[in-house]
Amino acid sequence: MQYDPIKRSLGSVFNSTPFLRKVFYRLLDLLLLRSWHIRREVRKWASTATGDISVLDAGSGFGQYDFYMSSKNPGWKIRGVDVKEEQIADCNAFFTRIGRRNVSFAFADLTAFTDASAYNLILSVDVMEHILEDVAVFRNFHASLKPGG
């Protein structure tokens, strides 16, 4: 099934105001069981995280996990990357409109992306099953983690 047309349609409705975007994030949290598990694991990880925290959301999509993490941890520096430039632009616009200066989004192909020892945590949800060169991506993730990350 092709999800991009559905995502585009949803985006055109929910991107019209910050309020609707937040409603959309809440609906995703309610409809997708994995959201509950991801938020739980991020909370557990955050309870032991110290110092300056940098997070990479690899395959950030609509940015719902970046919204969650930046809401709970405003001191974290969060970078979302994706291959869909339209979603990157939408996310940058939304997070700018709501004043979340600790979150940014950029284009990145995960098979070639590394940012040496930059991140304490790398989150990648519903992404790896779409990438044939998954071993290369995990090598890149490892190279991008800070020591102990």
What residue spans do the PLM features occupy?
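Conserved N-terminal segment of class I S-adenosyl-L-methionine
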Residues: M1-S117, L121, V125, V135-F138
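Short conserved AdoMet
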Residues: T50, L132, K146
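A short His-aromatic
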Residues: D126-H130
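Conserved phosphate-binding and hydrolysis motifs of nucleotide-dependent enzymes
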Residues: G59, G148-G149
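A short glycine-rich, Lys/Arg-flanked "PGG" loop and its adjoining helix->strand segment in the class I
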Residues: A136-P147
